[in-house]
Amino acid sequence: MIANALNGKPLPVYGQGLNVRDWLYVEDHCKAVDLIVRDGRIGEVYNIGGRNEMRNIDIVKLIIEDLGQGEITFVTDRKGHDLRYAIDPAKIKDELGWKPSTCFHDGIKKTIRWYLDNRSWWEEIISGEYQGYYQRMYGDR
C-alpha cells in the first residue's frame, strides 16, 4: 500500500475494507520470533499478536493521511475471505514475557518513514517479476 501510494498507483482494498486484522510492528514481530527460538519450549506453538485489531480501510486511510497522497480503489473481495483474524498472544506473554514495545501509530509512522528512506531498495522489488504477480492478483478487480 505504501509503495503504491508513493508511486501514484491505486490502493486496492478488498470489498469495503471492513476486514479486521491484528496489526503489529515488524521489529516487535522479529523480537518475538527470536525470543521463541531462544526461550520457547520445543514443539509448542506461540501466537504473536499485538492486540491491535483495526479494519483494513482504516489502515489505508492512515497511510493516505500521513503521506498526503493515495487513492483507494475497492476491489472484489476474495471468495471465503475471513472478515476477522483474531490473534490471542496470551501464551507468549504469560510464558515468555513478550509483548509489543511499539504502539501501532508509532509503528506505522516508522514503516512509512522506512519506505520514504529506502526507495531504491523496494523499487527494485516491485519491478519485473513482482509486477506479474501483482497483475495476476489484482488486475481484474
Language-model-detected regions and their locations in the chain:
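C-terminal substrate-binding subdomain of Rossmann-fold SDR/epimerase-dehydratase oxidoreductases
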Residues: 2-141
